[in-house]
Amino acid sequence: MIKVYNRITNEYEEENVAGKKFIKWTYETPVGKSITELIAKRKIFSKFYGKFCDTKCSAKKIPDFVRDFNIDMNIAEKNISEFNSFNDFFVRNLTSTSRPIDYNEDIFISPGDGRITVYDNIDLDNIVQVKGLTYSLRELIKNDEISERYKDGICIILRLCPTDYHRFHFVDSGIPCETHKIKGHYYSVNPIALNSIPKLFCENKREWCIFKSENFGDVLTVEVGATCVGSIIQTYEPNKKAKKGDEKGYFKFGGSTTILFLEKDKVKIDDDILEQSKQGYECKVLLGETIGTKVL
C-alpha cells in the first residue's frame, strides 16, 4: 500500500496504482526481477510500447483508464473523443484556469502535478532515494563542478504516476540553459521499484539543465525517464527568458520524475512537506501550488 498525504484534508490517502500487481511482480519476485533485467528496463521495451501509444488503436484504452482512475476531464482542453492516441491523451493540456500560478516573487511553486518529497541540508554523496538507499549528485548528473554548488542545499523530488498531468513547468522567471542528456535504463519510478533498485535515478535515462532563476538562485532541474516513457520532450528554448509557470517540457507515456536541486539558503520549504518527508510520506501537490518561500 502506498499512502500519500493530502495537504488540504490533512489526511493520508491510498494511491490507486496503475498496474500495481504487475509492478509488485516485476520488482518483488525472483522471476519478475529477472524479466525486468532482461526486458522491461531496456530501451527497446519502452520504445515499442511508446510507439503503440502513438497509434490510433491505442485511443480505445482512454475511456476505461479515465473511469478506473477517476481522472477529472473537465479541466482538460479536449474531450475524450478528440484524442488521436493514448499518448495524445497522456500529454493532454489543461485549461488555463485549472492550475493558477502565484506570481508573487517570494513564492516557490511546484513545477507540476504529483507526489512530492523534500530533503534539506543534503549531503551530496548520500542523497536519500528511500530510507536505507542513497545516491550521489555527481552520479546523477555526471558533473562534479556543478554538483558542488548544491552542498547543504535542498533536493525536491516530484514523482508523477501515469494518471497525472505530465507536463512540467518553470518555478520562477529566468533563463534556462541547454539540456544535457544522459543515457540509461527504464526502471519504474514507483515506490515499489525505488525500494528495490539501488541508485535508481542514476541508473535511468535522464536530462538536466541549470535554470538561472530571478529569485531562487541557480536551480538544477533533472527529468528522469521510466518504464514505457518513450521520450522526455523539452519544449523550452535554451538561453531565452522564460516566465514563471511557462511549460518546460513533458513526458510521454509512463510514470516519471522531476528532481530539483536548490542552493543553500535560497528557499524555505513549507513545514508540512518537510515533516511528512521526514516520516517517509509523499505530499500530493498540483502545478503552481506553493511549496516554499524565498529566504530573505
UniProtKB/Swiss-Prot annotation:
The record marks G255, S256 as: Cleavage (non-hydrolytic). It is an enzyme of class 4 (lyase). This is Phosphatidylserine decarboxylase proenzyme. InterPro entries: PS_Dcarbxylase, PSD-B, PSD_type2_pro. Is synthesized initially as an inactive proenzyme. Formation of the active enzyme involves a self-maturation process in which the active site pyruvoyl group is generated from an internal serine residue via an autocatalytic post-translational modification. Two non-identical subunits are generated from the proenzyme in this reaction, and the pyruvate is formed at the N-terminus of the alpha chain, which is derived from the carboxyl end of the proenzyme. Disulfide bonds: none annotated. PANTHER family: PHOSPHATIDYLSERINE DECARBOXYLASE, PHOSPHATIDYLSERINE DECARBOXYLASE PROENZYME 2. HAMAP family: PS_decarb_PSD_B_type2 (MF_00663). One of its GO terms (biological process) is phosphatidylethanolamine biosynthetic process. Catalyzes the formation of phosphatidylethanolamine (PtdEtn) from phosphatidylserine (PtdSer). Keywords: Cell membrane, Decarboxylase, Lipid biosynthesis, Lipid metabolism, Lyase, Membrane, Phospholipid biosynthesis, Phospholipid metabolism, Pyruvate, Zymogen. Binds 1 pyruvoyl group covalently per subunit. Heterodimer of a large membrane-associated beta subunit and a small pyruvoyl-containing alpha subunit.
